[in-house]
A protein has these predicted regions:
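N-terminal glycine-rich phosphate-binding loop and ensuing alpha1 helix
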Residues: 3-63
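Structural beta-sheet core signal
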Residues: 10-12, 56, 109, 134-137
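Short phosphate-binding loop-to-helix
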Residues: 71-106
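SAM-dependent methyltransferases
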Residues: 1-11, 15, 193-194, 212-214, ...
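Acidic helix N-cap motif at the loop->helix transition within catalytic regions
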Residues: 64-70
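Conserved core of the sugar-phosphate nucleotidyltransferase
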Residues: 116-208, 238
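Short, conserved active-site loop motifs that form the nucleotide-linked donor/cofactor pocket
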Residues: 8, 79-80, 163
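Residue-level signal for inorganic ion chemistry
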Residues: 12, 29, 38, 96, ...
């Protein structure tokens, strides 16, 4: 398929509770530089020339808040649907797939808690998926990796050369992704990311080297790091 014929939608699963962050507010809505963390990813998709629409999957109790305080307040006109998320991330993605327009060719999945994603990352992964069917942003492992037993004693050192840390965005042919989610639901397969499902189906997934700045906010200290990264790009507070 030529790039000009591809209709691409981004799905942002944002229904997690963020238990490791603590507190009553889910981490995707925590303030970062004065704005809800989720806003930063949506800004990138709003301005990206390769994204035609966005679907959010959020906690059911936050549907109104997301519509009024995030989508409407920040002018995110590309957000076409806000759907209730599921218990697991995989459920949230499946719910979002259920409202896709029939015109959609490619689907981009991005973690709501990766606020430092860039337009370049989105374009790279979309172009790779357009060519190969599936692609993800990832980082080569640079630290020494130890396999540790239940008693916290090192069992062995693992060769890090073939190891990469998966990030998002991840992009897939719509038909491949839908097929993988249907089969996973039918067989009770649980995956930690969508690329895992494609691997499980025997589909090739291309890897695009990303950036260490594309952090996933999971702990309070990550908010400080994320704010510093965003500030460094603008020369001021994000």
């Amino acid at each position: 398929m030529g790039r000009e014929r591809l209709h691409t939608v981004a799905i942002v699963p944002a229904a997690g509770l963020g238990l490791r962050m603590g507190g009553a507010v889910p981490k995707q809505f925590r303030p970062l530089g004065g704005l809800p963390l989720l806003v930063y990813s949506l800004r990138v998709f709003q301005s990206s020339p390769v994204i035609d629409a966005v679907i959010l999957a959020v906690p059911e109790a936050e549907l109104r808040y997301c519509q009024t305080d995030i989508v409407d307040a920040h002018g995110f006109t590309k957000v076409a649907h806000i759907v209730p998320g599921g218990r697991e991330r995989q459920d949230s993605v499946r719910h979002a797939l259920g409202v896709l327009d029939e015109r959609v060719d490619l689907v981009v999945i991005h973690d709501a808690v990766r606020p430092c994603v860039t337009e370049a990352m989105v374009s790279q992964v979309v172009d790779a998926a357009a060519a190969d069917g599936a692609a993800i942003i990832a980082l080569p492992m640079r630290d020494t990796v130890k396999q540790v037993g239940g008693d916290r004693v090192i069992e062995r050192t693992i060769d890090r050369k073939p190891l990469w840390l998966a990030q998002t965005p991840q992009a897939f042919r719509r038909d491949w992704l839908e097929e993988a989610h249907r089969k996973a639901q039918a067989e009770g397969m649980a995956a930690t990311d969508d690329a895992y499902l494609l691997e499980w189906m025997g589909r090739p997934v291309r890897v695009i080297e990303g950036s260490g700045e594309n952090i996933k906010v999971t702990r309070p200290e990550d908010l400080v790091i994320g704010e510093a990264i965003l500030a460094s790009r603008t020369g001021r507070r994000p």
